[in-house]
Regions:
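Small-residue-enriched hydrophobic alpha-helices in membranes
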Residues: 1-123
Length: 123
């Protein structure tokens, strides 16, 4: 799957929101958050610059960008966000609510967590 810089920044911003959803930033969540950047070809030394770009993006721009992704990309992002959520082995209600909010406002296909994770792992 290929994403342009703006799309990747939107995905990273959504991922960062997932990391912060329960009020605790866990190392395991950051590992998934930044590990995905490597899968998209972003060198480790540029990860922080990408995070700065993501943080500078307005939420409305993030949602607009995510809404315009292909259906396959939306499923992938839903799984990626779910992977961040489960990475610390402690699924908090606030994380589930954040995942549902992002998926709804971004018009992602209806999926449960397990379906989203399975799609992400297989793609």
């Amino acid at each position: 799957m290929t994403l342009n810089g703006k799309e990747l920044a939107a995905v990273l911003k959504a991922g960062h929101a997932m990391v912060q959803a329960d009020g605790k930033v866990e190392e395991s969540e950051l590992k998934v958050l930044f590990g995905e950047l490597a899968n998209f070809g972003v060198p480790a030394e540029q990860a922080q610059l990408m995070m700065v770009a993501a943080d500078a993006m307005e939420a409305s721009e993030m949602f607009e960008t995510l809404t315009n992704l292909s259906t396959e990309a939306k499923k992938y992002v839903a799984g990626y966000l779910a992977a961040i959520m489960i990475s610390d082995n402690d699924i908090d209600d606030s994380e589930v609510n954040m995942w549902k909010l992002i998926c709804t406002l971004s018009k992602f296909p209806t999926m449960n967590l397990n379906e989203a994770l399975t799609f992400w792992r297989n793609n």
